[in-house]
Amino acid sequence: DLNVVYDWLSFNAGYNYIDKPMVWIATLYQGKDITFMRNVNFNHSKDVYVSIVASPRFGWYNPMAEIDYTQSFLCIDGFDINKPTNRPCFNFRLNNRFNITSTLKAFLTMRYKTSRLYDLQYSKQFAQVDVKFTKSFLNDALVLGVYANDLFKTDKERWTMYGNRNVMTKDCYGYTRCVGMTLSYNFNTAKSTYKGTGAGNTEKNRL
């Protein structure tokens, strides 16, 4: 694993090798049309990943852009599984923070993830856009938030799991589209720390 950070830019890359990984697999029960799930040891699996994150500041506008690359390789030797070839997955995220005033802030989060094959599950691409507004009162002690998630109803759950001589699929919407409101109160806005009276110093010195 390699991590490099310079000012508002960070880079991360890594490689994992797992010997005898436990993988969730669908199996036919006694050759009948009955499928059950179980964990099975495979020979080995490998993962590679790269991530770049940029979080500059432009006065009242604070963006955070992230690009991720991941790819997994599972050895299925000895199993009757007809899964697609391994392919890379890319994840794009853009978090936008707008400091409209000292007490009013707006957040716009956009995310897109390409299709990927992880172990035995192939997941299709999905996207999501969220928006949020916060307003603070009483010197930031009271914070009111209003949010809306998955504005365009694009965060769908679509996957195919390849098992031992069988295939399972799911294509649906998880009903993540919603609006809501939050209210929070911060009891220690000054971030003061209680230092104590030193009553335990004698015991600590003894130990």
Language-model region placement:
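Outer-membrane beta-barrel proteins
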Residues: 1, 36-42, 53-55, 80-84, ...
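Repeated loop/turn-to-beta-strand initiation elements of outer-membrane beta-barrel proteins
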Residues: 8-11, 60-65, 102-108, 139-144, ...
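Outer-membrane beta-barrel translocator domains and adjoining extracellular loop/strand segments
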Residues: 21-30, 74-83, 117-124, 157-163, ...
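C-terminal beta-barrel architecture of Gram-negative outer-membrane proteins
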Residues: 69-74, 89-137, 149-152, 160-161, ...
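C-terminal beta-signal and adjacent terminal beta-strands/loops
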Residues: 137-207
